């Protein structure tokens, strides 16, 4: 196939945000998705946060790879240039993941959701964050017919 699936996401919020699951509802999935991840940070390659301790403080660690990365972090609003206000703001983060080596295949429809769960001083909680995402679909025309997909049950991880 000549199609490519890619996803980018930006998150602006305070405290840890990465416990929510990425869910891919494929070809008529209703209540339960065909693909359900283990956490937002896992989906973008963090596996165990994106931070390390430096002199007793938590420091975010950016990274870039060919297929996923975390290239952007800032707690400063670069658009604020005002004598009466500093540029502090809630942390902003930018991630990407290209589904080239692990395409999400579907015949009719695809719905992707992110569950917003975070951790604060009281433990896990449902969040309401500013999240923006972009998904790309590339396909050249004309093209040969795609091979039929296996049933969604046959595509489940083993």
Where on the chain are the PLM-derived regions?
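Extended, compositionally biased non-globular segments
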Residues: 22-139
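Short linear, low-complexity motifs centered on an aromatic residue
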Residues: 20-22, 157
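Serine/threonine-rich low-complexity intrinsically disordered regions
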Residues: 9, 74-76, 151
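Preference for intrinsically disordered or flexible, low-complexity segments
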Residues: 1, 14-17, 24, 88
């Amino acid at each position: 196939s000549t199609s490519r699936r890619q996803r980018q996401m930006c998150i602006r919020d305070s405290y840890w945000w990465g416990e929510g699951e990425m869910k891919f509802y494929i070809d008529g999935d209703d209540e339960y998705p065909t693909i359900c991840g283990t956490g937002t940070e896992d989906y973008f390659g963090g596996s165990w946060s994106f931070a390390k301790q430096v002199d007793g403080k938590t420091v975010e660690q950016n990274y870039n790879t060919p297929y996923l990365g975390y290239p952007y972090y800032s707690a400063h609003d670069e658009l604020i240039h005002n004598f009466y206000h500093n540029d502090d703001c809630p942390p902003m983060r930018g991630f990407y993941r290209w589904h080239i080596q692990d395409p999400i295949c579907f015949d009719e429809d695809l719905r992707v959701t992110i569950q917003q769960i975070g951790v604060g001083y009281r433990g896990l909680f449902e969040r309401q964050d500013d999240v923006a995402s972009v998904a790309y679909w590339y396909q050249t025309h004309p093209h040969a017919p795609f091979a039929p997909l296996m049933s969604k049950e046959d595509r489940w991880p083993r």
